[in-house]
Amino acid sequence: MMRALIAVIALAVAVPAVAQQPPAAPPPKLPPVVVEGTRVPDERTAPEEQAREEIRRVPGGVDVIGEQGIKESRAANLQDVLGLVPGVWIRPRFGADESQISIRGSGLRNNFHLRGVNVLLDGFPYGNADGFSDFESLELLDTKRVEIYKGANALRFGGNTLGGAINLITKTGYDAGLIEVRSEAGSFGFFKNHLATGQVYGPFDLYLGLTDVELDGYRDHSDQMRRRVYSSGGYRLPGGTTVRFDLNYVRSQENLPGALTQPELDRDPRRADPANLNLRMKAARDYDYVRGALTVRTPLSETQTLEWGTQLNYQDLHHPLSFAVIDDTTYSYSTELRWINAAPLFDHGNRLTVGLQYFGTRQIDANFTNVAGAPAVLTKNQFNIANTVGLYAENQLDVTPAFTAIVGGRGQYSTREVRDRFLRDGPGDIDFNDSDSVDFLSFSPRGGFVWRAGRTAQVYGNVSHSYEPPLLLELTAPGQLQGNLGQLAAQKALQFELGTRGSLGKRLGWDLSVYDIELWDEIQNVNVQPFPGAPFTIPRYRNIDRSRHTGVEAGADLLLIEDLARRVGLGAAGDALRLRAAYTYSRFVFVDDVNFDNNDLPGAPRHFLRAELRYDHASGFWFAPNVETVPHGYYVNSENNARTQAYTAVGTRLGYTYKPWQLAVFFEGRNLGNVTYTSSVVVDAANRRFFEPADGRAFYGGLEWRFR
């Protein structure tokens, strides 16, 4: 298998295929190798091009989306922003924020929220101690850059997951105008308003962003509301130390339409699951969320930097579902110390990163019977605890001016504990005590290289191990056997990856990764009916003995024509026509499984292509028709007897920026053919409600004004 991978990469180096770059961007300049030690830049204040140079030090698949790429679309969820990043499979569940996210087959079991991908905020982990997280609390318009580390390539931040990491770099007072106003509106009752201000006062900088989002929804019972507040205050001390405090507040309310059967999807994709729409159930998810984070960055010398971050977040969740009303209160806190030393080693360029992390989560987990969406009779009352301690290190040594060797690893100790406070939950008030605890210990090594094959071309590769203990919600799911947290083993994976990236002048850019991941004990969600004929399912998790994920991630940015307007007498030079494309091949399979032999793992297509043809005029006008296609449907159950349907959806975007006034407008049309297709899926649903429809034909527009 690896010989085949090496052959593919050798061919790719000889005949480059391509990667996503921002439109009309200058050709990337790969980071030069220098023997002199250099100070590592501050991610919060580093310019975008410097961030791109930094991320190209990673010996694996990576990408960066800058502020322009964020703001030129609706930017309601990560699919809006990362649609042209190969290898990232993002599917909105019912229109707006909440999405299924899978990178290299991570989180195929997800039919809600996020797992298998580390979410980072400004380089530090975001979410709970067990790895559970979501993106609904984060506002993309308060973000100046999104960095994607695909697969086991996020060790520089302590990442240890199959899917890698998505790092959102948020704005500070250095990044915003005195006044920034943005308003968006569109189909299905979509409205989004954003007001922000940022300013620098000597050594102080302040940023404040306020966002209001409302959506009636394409489907019945899918209306949503978000209120977000984000603020950041920083202070630079003499000597270069920076201290920064960030504060987030979110109020979220959303109704849940649920999944459909194939006949329901064909007849009326706008309908909701009758069980979720039932007035006696009122399936919904409402919460309040608060997060405070303090970071300190201190230069110890010209080549050494010490970073410390700590955060506390609180969530109060009210979550009516068919089988229960979940009322949870969750507190999570973390602290991390990271030392970066870029001093030369034996007259060779070198960078050493060492980090120590601690995460803790405490959760009051109560379930009640559901009466019209309100809690009635208590059926579960637990105090759940998760702790994680991680120690990681990565060293990048420039063996020659053109070749960098990378070695590293992460040691981790994790615990999961349940303290049952509701003992009389058996027949006839029999005491069922579900209290239990379990721990996990691991070491995940990593080795890789980056070879600078030319001034603007790289070849890279790595062999990396990842380790993911089960989440609390997987150990305590209503479908699990009670009183034994040790049913689920941690998921282990060994990744082999080779790739190449770079550019040929300004005409061509490419990014190609080929990977083979061997997995043991992959965690899979089987959604079972709690009793025969039940109109709903409950989650039950199991380990798959052996599985394999292989794939190809190929991106392209090709300059087709430039200065066309000048040639035909329609304007000055500076216009350009570019073709950008992202292709993902994914083959995720069981390996000699006792039940499913070598079937496909459900949840992701073999082939996925998205492409955009974009014209930029020197006046500030741009126009970009696009297409995405899944040419063959993919399986949604492990038996491989149910699958989605193939689809092709076309859309278009256009906009205009009037720089003297700092005024920008955009317009977007999606699914212009009004094609009915599946956006996300509920895998292995016993009631065969697998399909969550994509939105029909939709139009969106927005206006933004900035005053410096």
Feature names for model-found ranges:
Residues Q21-K71, P299:
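Short, acidic, small-residue-rich periplasmic hinge/interaction motif at the N-terminus
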Residues P47, A51-R52, P59-V62, Q79-F124, ...:
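Extracytoplasmic beta-strand/coil segments of soluble accessory domains associated
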Residues L108, V117, F124-K150:
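Short acidic/polar hinge/loop motifs at secondary-structure boundaries
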Residues L178-E180, A185-E214, R219-P257, A284-T295, ...:
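Transmembrane beta-barrel wall of Gram-negative outer-membrane proteins
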Residues L195, T305-H318, R452, Q458-E468, ...:
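Membrane-embedded beta-barrel scaffold of Gram-negative outer-membrane proteins
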Residues R236, N395, G461, L494-F496, ...:
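Conserved C-terminal beta-signal and adjacent last beta-strands/turns
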Residues N248, L345-F359, Q382-L519, R614:
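Structural signature of Gram-negative outer-membrane beta-barrels, strongest in the C-terminal barrel
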Residues Y413, D511-L519, F536-N637, E704-R706:
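Gram-negative outer-membrane beta-barrel transporters
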